[in-house]
Amino acid sequence: MAEKTYPMTLAEKEKLEKELEELKLVRRPEVVERIKIARSYGDLSENSEYEAAKDEQAFVEGQISSLETKIRYAEIVDSDAVAKDEVGIGKTVTIQEVGETEKEVYIIVGSAGADAFAGKVSNESPIGQALIGKKKGDIATVETPVGSYDVKILKVEKTK
């Protein structure tokens, strides 16, 4: 079975590579040192510091594994290859819910780069799926678990 690919921009991949380096060169050694110190306290059966450090080690190793997979199977998307006025990964899109006045701006990214607080939505999210391939002036229907709503695409531009 073929591995899943992770569409992303080159900048997203570079960000993941930096995160991976930080985990391997800083966080992993810190956790190993905490485990070593906690072991020195003696009886491991009731050693909460040891348990906490082992839990953190498992978390860090899981993050490392996840990032390595995403980087290994990264599919670099060139936003220039997508039509200038078409929504795709690496594009910034301004939308407005039909019947509302407030405008919203989103950057479309691969799933690895999603960050709702920074306005970066995954191409796999409900809003990302609704917008991909659409153009300025189009109406897109966003399907969510609690219902659907329509948005009008006001502007599409390459993310700076």
Swiss-Prot record:
**Which organism's genome codes for this protein?**
Streptococcus gordonii (strain Challis / ATCC 35105 / BCRC 15272 / CH1 / DL1 / V288)
Alphabetical UniProt keywords: Coiled coil, DNA-binding, Transcription, Transcription regulation
What name is this protein filed under? Transcription elongation factor GreA
Coiled-coil stretches, from where to where?
A: 1-72
Q: HAMAP family per the record?
A: GreA_GreB (MF_00105)
Encoding gene (name): greA
User: Source organism lineage?
Assistant: Bacteria, Bacillati, Bacillota, Bacilli, Lactobacillales
What is the purpose of this protein? Necessary for efficient RNA polymerase transcription elongation past template-encoded arresting sites. The arresting sites in DNA have the property of trapping a certain fraction of elongating RNA polymerases that pass through, resulting in locked ternary complexes. Cleavage of the nascent transcript by cleavage factors such as GreA or GreB allows the resumption of elongation from the new 3'terminus. GreA releases sequences of 2 to 3 nucleotides.
Q: List the disulfide bonds.
A: none
- Gene Ontology biological process: DNA-templated transcription elongation; regulation of DNA-templated transcription elongation
Name the family the entry cites: Belongs to the GreA/GreB family.
Q: One GO molecular function term?
A: RNA polymerase binding
